[in-house]
Amino acid sequence: MPAEPRAVALVKLSSLGDVVHALPVAEALAAAFPRARLVWIVERREAALLRDHPALDEVIDVDTRAWRSARTPRQVAEVVRGLVVLRRRLRAARFDVAIDLQGLVKSGAVTRATGAPLRIGFAAGWSRERLNALFTTRRVTPPLEARHVVDQYLALLAPLGVAVSPGRARFRLATRAAAELRIDDFFVGVGLKPRHRLVVLNPGAGRTNKRWPVARFRALAERLCHEAGAQVLVLWGPSERDVARAIVDIPVPRPALAPPTDLDELAAVTRRASVMVAGDTGPLHLAAAVGTPCVGLYGPTSAARNGPYGAGHRVLAAPDGRMASIDVPPVLEAVLEVLGR
């Protein structure tokens, strides 16, 4: 490898929150090696978050979900053809370095497919799947002070001589005018004022044990609307609309129900919030990345490792790991603290 890499592949396939947490790696690489070509390999579903990112030269999307779901001979043949095309594309890029930020077997296989002579990943004890170490040539153990996952990702840059102090990571996200305009139109239509005591609630989560009970979200929304004079907007994702409606269905004044949102529109919503309330989810980390104060609700996952990154946030962690152990009053108090009462 030359003293300064010519082409670097970042492999962080999913999910939304994890991709957000890895963004500072691209920023740090772009600052350290401004002439290097930076390419991010990511799942198709999360790719929109990275399109037009100022630190990246290219985004390559893959569909590992389709790889895993192939059952018929025709589907398998299509997957194989796609993998051959992907491998050729990666080899043609002539990567000097590939960095596996995910630590899985599938991410390791993609990292290996880049053909990069230097393939950096986590040491076996830090990888999510131990066999991931088979695909990397340089394995890193993050320092003790790197408690947050963002800082652990940045530790993977040490073999390249790049260092970012814990807590000093930088986030940037591309903005898209069309998405911003659609959300502006929605706000006007429902009478919401951006950043004016606007509390955005995100009741969903990828795992059921990371979800705060719907009844608690509803009680919080009612107190915010009726006692705190706050505006409340409830987000929802696939299969979550009924949950959001149950939270919105309170006596007037009631929360607004968000429209269906893609990733660009979700980012636009979080930019307009005064505070985001959510569990350990992608929308929470997206809000933190755009600079919106967050109230994070944590049960089975570590708030020290996975909490909203940066200053100005509040975290409530259930001592027994159960989301139902977090009651409404302390969450309300945390929101009011952020709002300035």
Question: Each predicted region: which residue ranges?
Answer:
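Catalytic machinery of carbohydrate-active enzymes
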Residues: 1-341
